[in-house]
Curated annotation (Swiss-Prot):
Factor of infectivity and pathogenicity, required for optimal virus replication. Alters numerous pathways of T-lymphocyte function and down-regulates immunity surface molecules in order to evade host defense and increase viral infectivity. Alters the functionality of other immunity cells, like dendritic cells, monocytes/macrophages and NK cells. One of the earliest and most abundantly expressed viral proteins. GO terms for molecular function: GTP binding. A lipid is attached at G2 (N-myristoyl glycine). It is a lipid-anchor. It comes from the Viruses. The lineage of its organism: Viruses, Riboviria, Pararnavirae, Artverviricota, Revtraviricetes. This is Protein Nef.
Length: 256
């Protein structure tokens, strides 16, 4: 999906997956294996994975919504504010993990629906995110990678609030975050858990859930986020202000 409409697309290297796996999990970065209900350890450089005991266990087009909250292009001030809030704490170790140049290879541009679908497909083809534990650091590394390699301004990767499945706010990004159950016995396996990337990533979530990235091709056809949670788009939702604020309050989501 997405290939026929593109003239040319760059090829993210498989190294992106390795760098994301190393982030927060050290040499023990891993993937959630749904079929096994457990943890798969990635051995750097080998391209192989080794099973370990579980430690954690209607279609729509872009113009179909009159009130679809398409992002207003960010101002330079907003871009700088984003960088200060989200990128300043990315240290030299993160630069090494990302493995890209300090400057973008192409002119900066805003993410579009078509680009989001294409990037989602490319990353899937490379095995980059499926089953990978989510963490704030991996989130930032992905932002940096796409900014430097593709020139995509890193203001697009946001997800709905929990509990439960977190859907991408940007229509066209086909990766959602799905909570996985951590078996109680796994939490008692001290040696593995202290090294296990998921034991770090769950603390990145205010609801304490351990999340993994999961590819969902239907997100290219249905704006699930806007259908289920229009209140999260605030003034851009098309709802009366009192209504969307009431819904956010009922869900315990802060708003201004």
């Amino acid at each position: 999906m997405g290939a026929s409409g593109s003239k040319k697309r760059s090829r993210p290297s498989r190294g992106l997956q390795e760098r994301l796996l190393r982030a927060r999990g050290g040499a023990c970065g891993g993937l959630w294996d749904e079929s096994e209900g457990g943890y798969s350890q990635f051995h750097e450089g080998s391209g192989r994975e080794q099973k370990l005991p579980s430690c954690e266990g209607q279609r729509y087009q872009q113009g179909d919504f009159m009130n679809t909250p398409w992002r207003t292009p960010a101002t330079e001030k907003e871009k700088e504010s984003y960088r200060q809030q989200n990128m300043d704490d990315v240290d030299s170790d993160d630069d090494d993990l990302v493995g890209v140049s300090d400057t973008s290879r192409v002119p900066l541009r805003a993410m579009t629906y078509r680009m989001a679908v294409d990037m989602s497909d490319l990353i899937k083809d490379k095995g980059g995110l499926e089953g990978m534990y989510y963490s704030e650091r991996r989130h930032r590394i992905l932002d940096i990678y796409l900014e430097k390699e593709e020139g995509i301004i890193p203001d697009w990767q946001n997800y709905t609030h929990g509990l439960g499945v977190r859907y991408p706010m940007f229509f066209g990004w086909l990766w959602k975050l799905v909570p996985v159950t951590v078996p109680q016995e796994g939490e008692d396996t001290e040696t593995l858990c202290l090294m296990h990337s998921a034991q770090v990533s769950r603390f990145d979530d205010p609801h304490g859930e351990t999340l993994v990235w999961k590819f969902d091709p239907m997100l290219a056809h249905e704006y699930t986020t806007f259908i289920l949670y229009p209140e999260e788009f605030g003034h851009k939702s098309g709802m009366e202000e009192d209504d969307w604020k009431a819904k956010l309050k009922a869900r315990g989501i802060p708003f201004s």
